[in-house]
Amino acid sequence: MNKEQKIIDVWMQHPNLDFINHDMFASLRRWMGIDKVTEEIPVEITVSAMDEGQVQKGLICAWWGPGGELISNDEVAASIKRFPDRFVGIGSVNRYKPMDAVREVKRCVNKL
């Protein structure tokens, strides 16, 4: 890769405890020999991994799945505030509640 090429990760999450301890990641935790993660992972760990992979920017995503919110829009906004030159945010909403979703999109655009 030459120095003029830029790497952008277009789908990333910075895991919080709800996300990493969710049942969908149970096999990953078993494979890693981890029963349950009990301490928050600092966002600096994600930035460090980006540095190691020569990723200049990441589109960091909130996550609202069928079981509810796992990574909030506010958490994504906090990561962007800490590292504005490294992250661009992608919000998430509860698609099963369309009016709440519209209000949340407006909140994200106007306040976050």
Describe the function of each predicted region.
Residues M1-L112:
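Helix-coil boundary/capping segments in enzymes
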